[in-house]
């Protein structure tokens, strides 16, 4: 039997591929159209396991684009390799193929109360946000990410559900 140290087990766990955006806090079970945890739409949460790779990639890409928009408005990642090193050293899971701004979100989401110097992680806050505490900034990131996801749903998804329901009612 092979024995691994705790550090090696954490390393293996942190580098397992992330197969779903789920963060374990699904609010769609309570009727939300957009999950407050992972920001997927209710039908994406329900149908995820039936999606093919292209459908899953489309969801991942939308989530990435919205999150990057939120993050770039408040901070700059100036050293991607340092950020990656810090994530790996702290066993924080991240999607390697995503933008470093998504990585920054993962780091801040998990370490906002412990991080004292963002520059040590390859990031810096933009001037208008330098007086914010990281836990408040983390909450602002999450709130804006949710609001953008909700707006996207209302603009592009809800009208098609309404149209489909009306067409079925006429059938």
Residue ranges and their predicted role:
Residues 1, 5, 94-95, 118, ...:
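Extended hydrophobic/Leu-rich segments
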Residues 3, 10-11, 93, 128, ...:
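Intrinsic disorder/low-structure terminal segments
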Residues 2-76:
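N-terminal cysteine/histidine-rich coordination modules
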Residues 19, 23, 57-64, 84, ...:
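Generic detector of well-ordered alpha-helical segments enriched in charged/polar residues
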């Amino acid at each position: 039997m092979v024995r691994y140290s705790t550090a090696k087990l954490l390393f293996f766990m942190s580098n397992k591929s992330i197969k779903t955006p789920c963060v374990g806090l699904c609010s769609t079970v309570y009727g939300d159209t957009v999950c407050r945890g992972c920001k997927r739409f209710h039908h994406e949460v329900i149908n995820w396991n039936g999606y093919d790779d292209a459908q899953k990639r489309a969801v991942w890409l939308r989530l990435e684009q919205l999150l990057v928009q939120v993050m770039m408005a408040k901070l700059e990642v100036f050293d991607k390799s340092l950020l990656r090193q810090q994530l790996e050293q702290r066993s924080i899971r991240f999607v390697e193929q995503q933008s470093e701004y998504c990585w920054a979100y993962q780091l801040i989401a998990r370490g906002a109360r412990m991080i004292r110097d963002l520059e040590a992680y390859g990031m810096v806050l933009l001037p208008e946000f330098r007086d914010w505490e990281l836990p408040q900034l983390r909450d602002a990131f999450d709130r804006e990410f949710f609001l953008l996801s909700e707006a996207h749903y209302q603009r592009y998804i809800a009208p098609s559900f309404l149209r489909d329901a009306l067409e079925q009612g006429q059938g």
